[in-house]
Amino acid sequence: ALPQATALDGTLTANSRAKAKAPVSITGCASGNGADGNRNVRVVADTIYWPLPEGSYTITSPFTMRISPVSGQLLAHEGIDMAAPLDTPITAVYGGVVEEVAENSRSGAYVQIKHTKSDGTVFHSAYLHQYMNKIKVKVGDTVTAGQVIGAVGNNGWSTGPHLHFEIHDSSDTPVDPEAWMETNKAVYLGQESCS
């Protein structure tokens, strides 16, 4: 029950009492108890985030077969290249467990995360061309959606600072990350919507 409202001068009209008891409209995402204090409400669930801040990048190479700008070979480009300033923060697209942090001459330093959505769907995300000293997670770490995990680099087979971003399905097969993000209604950090 709502507490009794009392006007500063001690009087309260029927009209003002009705306004005092009117439901409150919440425009953001609530957590914990509902506005009435009695029922639980669902917090933002299954929100997928773009890995770089809005307006910070340009997609310079899509998910496709292409001639590698480094090797000159025809290769499957299993992600998208997001050109961005060096050291732009990279965030986890969804909560999960870090399954790999490594470095090689082709990918530079990279992070791969395994995610399990609330419906049980498993997917993996990978973030390449970083510098090892900028990576903020290690294998086995649990990360939250939107958590900073590293920074844009120019390491490995790279012609300029960018994030090579991949999404893999439950069988670890690469899928088009741009289409996948759009299908899963990805938002930028700070643009969450209640569902």
Where are these regions (language model features)?
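Short histidine-centered loop motifs in beta-beta connectors
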Residues: 85, 91, 101, 121-146, ...
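Surface-exposed, glycine-biased beta-strand/turn segments
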Residues: 22-109
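Short hydrophobic beta/alpha edge segments that flank linear recognition/processing sites
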Residues: 82, 110-111, 146-156
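Short aromatic-glycine-enriched beta-strand elements
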Residues: 106-113, 161-165
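Acidic, glycine-rich catalytic/binding loops that coordinate metals and/or anionic ligands
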Residues: 135, 141, 166-195
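N-terminal secretion targeting segments of exported proteins
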Residues: 1-34, 195
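OB-fold (S1/OB) nucleic-acid-binding surfaces
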Residues: 113-122
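Histidine-centered divalent metal-coordination motifs
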Residues: 77-79, 129, 162-166
